[in-house]
Design a protein with these regions (language model features):
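Juxta-kinase regulatory segment immediately upstream of eukaryotic protein kinase catalytic domains
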Residues: 1-16, 211-212, 222-224
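ATP-binding glycine-rich loop module of kinase domains
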Residues: 11-65
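Conserved hydrophobic "DFG−1" position in protein kinase catalytic cores
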Residues: 27-28, 40, 88-89, 97, ...
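Conserved structural core of kinase catalytic domains
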Residues: 53, 65-68, 72-118
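AlphaC helix (C-helix) of the protein kinase catalytic domain N-lobe
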Residues: 60, 64-67, 124, 181
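Conserved hydrophobic alpha-helix
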Residues: 120-127, 134
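Catalytic-loop of the protein kinase fold
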Residues: 129-145
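C-lobe/activation-segment region of protein kinase-like
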Residues: 146-225
Length: 225
C-alpha cells in the first residue's frame, strides 16, 4: 500500500491556481523533509474533472511510473484519488528560467555545462527506443537542471506510446522531441553543436515546417508565465 500523508502534518503551498481545464498545483512539505508536487483537478467543473482531469492524471502517472528507473523523471508518482496525483519535487531551475549567456554582458557566463545537454539528448533517445515520446519539450519549463546538475523532464500529460504507430509517424513524433532539446542545446551552447546534431536539428525543423506542427501550449496565460 502506498504511504499516505496526513493533511494536518504537511505544509501545503499553492503554486498555480489552475483554470478552466488546468489543475491546481501545490508544493507539499512533510515533517520529515520530503517535498512533493501535487496536481489536483478537483476544483474544476464536474464535466472537466471527470473527463480531462481523470484522463490526464491517469496518463501522467502511467508514464512517470514507466520511466521512473531512468532517473530523468520525478519519482514516487502516484494517484491520490481520481482527480489528483503527487510526484517528488525536483529542486532546480527550468531552462526557461536560466538566461541565455551573452558575451557582451560581464558576468553572463554559461551556467549549464555541455555535458548536461549530451546526457539529456542521449536519455531522450533511450526513451524513444522504449516506445515513448514526450511531445512538449519545446516548452522549456518542462526541462529542469536539477540541483545536482542532471536533467529532469516534467509534465508527461502529452506523452504517447509509439510501438503500434507506423514508422514514418513514429519518426515524426520523435523529431518533435528532438527539435525541442536540440534548440535548447543550440541556444546555450551553439559552439558545441557538432555536424551530426546540427543536421538532426535542421532535419527536425524541415519536418515541422512541412507538416505545420504548432507548439503545444496549455493556455495563453500559462505561455506568458
Amino acid at each position: 500500500m502506498e504511504p499516505t500523508i496526513s493533511n494536518r502534518s504537511v505544509k501545503k503551498t499553492l503554486l498555480h491556481k489552475g483554470g478552466f481545464a488546468n489543475a491546481k498545483i501545490y508544493r507539499l512539505e512533510t515533517p520529515d523533509g520530503e517535498v512533493f508536487i501535487e496536481k489536483d483537478f478537483s476544483g474544476c467543473s464536474f464535466l472537466i474533472r471527470n473527463t480531462i482531469g481523470r484522463f490526464l492524471i491517469r496518463r501522467e502517472v502511467h508514464y512517470l511510473l514507466r520511466l521512473e528507473e531512468t532517473g530523468i523523471v520525478p519519482g514516487k508518482a502516484r494517484r491520490i484519488g481520481p482527480f489528483c496525483m503527487r510526484e517528488t519535487f525536483c529542486d532546480g531551475q527550468t531552462l526557461r528560467e536560466i538566461p541565455k549567456p551573452n558575451p557582451k554582458v560581464p558576468g553572463s557566463e554559461n551556467r549549464i555545462p555541455v555535458a548536461y545537454f549530451h546526457t539529456l539528448f542521449n536519455a531522450l533517445q533511450n526513451i524513444h527506443q522504449s516506445g515513448i515520446v514526450h511531445l512538449d519539450l519545446h516548452n522549456l519549463r518542462n526541462i529542469i537542471v536539477s540541483a545536482d546538475g542532471t536533467p529532469v523532464l516534467l509534465d508527461w500529460q502529452s506523452a504517447i506510446h509509439t510501438r503500434l504507430l507506423l514508422p514514418p509517424i513514429r519518426r515524426l513524433l520523435e523529431n518533435i522531441d528532438n527539435m525541442g532539446v536540440l534548440k535548447a542545446f543550440d541556444k546555450f551552447h551553439p559552439e558545441a553543436m557538432n555536424d551530426e546534431l546540427s543536421k538532426k536539428l535542421e532535419h527536425a525543423k524541415k519536418i515541422r515546417r512541412r507538416f505545420w506542427l504548432p507548439r503545444i501550449h496549455l493556455t495563453r496565460k500559462d505561455a506568458k508565465k
